[in-house]
Amino acid sequence: MSAPTLSRRRVLTAGLASIALPVWAANERTSLQVWKDPNCGCCKDWIAHLEKNGFAATVIDQGNNAARARLGMPQKFGSCHTALIQGYVIEGHVPAADIQRLLKEKPKALGLSVPGMPVGSPGMDGPSYDNRRDAYQVLLIQRDGSTTVFNTYPRG
């Protein structure tokens, strides 16, 4: 019984597949839904920040109050847009890196919030804000409404 021989074509095909698979996987974008007011510029800028960081947003331009209530995010953590990603609620100008960390760690929680609209957070940043950055916190919101600090961003 002789050992199977590998043709040049099979070796080449296997090599190309091993290169193509990681490239294809790296291009996979994580989908989320975003509810916002159709005229909100900072919401559009936050979505652009997410899309630059590997997310694909489906935008619902009908405001976010009803979505926030339906998804269980307490009003006191409210902001100008609400998102849903892999079962987590994202409220406000949460940085993409914190959402990526949330999806990696998968804590038992409702989601994340950056209450209000702090200057310097994604979507509230850049030259139109004189590159100012106020201190703010990203909160991990539990289903019972309790919170812990997920990340802190200092004044800059």
Q: Language-model segments: which ranges?
A:
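Solvent-exposed loop/turn segments at secondary-structure junctions
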Residues: 39-41, 64-66, 89-90, 118-120
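Typically the conserved alpha-helix immediately C-terminal to a functionally engaged Cys/Sec
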Residues: 46-49
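Short phosphate-binding/catalytic loops that engage adenosine nucleotides
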Residues: 55
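Local sequence-structure signature of Cys/Sec-based thiol-disulfide redox active-site neighborhoods
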Residues: 30-42
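Thiol-based oxidoreductase modules, predominantly thioredoxin-like and allied folds used
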Residues: 58-67, 77
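Thiol/selenol-based redox catalytic cores and closely related redox-interacting motifs
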Residues: 76-156
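Boundary at the C-terminal end of the N-terminal hydrophobic targeting segment
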Residues: 23-25
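N-terminal secretory signal peptides and thylakoid transit peptides that target proteins
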Residues: 1-18
